[in-house]
Amino acid sequence: MLDAKKIATTVKDLVKPISDNLGFRLFDVEFKPENGWVLRIIIDKEGGVTIDDCEELSKRVSALLDVEDVITSSYFLEVSSPGLTRELKEKWHYEFFKGKYARLYLKEKIDNKQEYAGYIDSVEDDTLVLRLLDKTLKIPFDKIAKARLDVEKW
């Protein structure tokens, strides 16, 4: 059986130097079953990612993975930008998007709520500081179940 997390981590380590060399920030790598296996590589760069950027990285990664033979089953390779409502998984994602509006779903309630939306104020060690309308909330990263950038509600 395939170890999806291990494959994603290995691919991430292999792809990062190529991504960096092309001027991209490697945002995430996922390997998931979706009507067959999908290797999803998500990149970003200042000014945004173009289709040509995705195509260039896809060609290079495809050639590399053919040689490295990390994935033993058939799969689809998908290279894309993270999109407007990108998921925030790594600590650096929060630092990178400081000042942006985000929606967080917590593993357990804080102040009697399990979902918060506000501005990413800062990162302090292992804690996210989220600026809400009426207060600032400190949320330990290990309490966050899922987080993503969101579009402000008017």
From Swiss-Prot:
The lineage of its organism: Bacteria, Pseudomonadati, Aquificota, Aquificia, Aquificales. Keywords: Cytoplasm, Ribosome biogenesis. This is Ribosome maturation factor RimP. The keyword Cytoplasm applies. It is found in: Cytoplasm. Pfam families: DUF150_C (PF17384), RimP_N (PF02576). Its main location: cytoplasm. SUPFAM superfamilies: YhbC-like, C-terminal domain, YhbC-like, N-terminal domain. It comes from Hydrogenobaculum sp. (strain Y04AAS1).
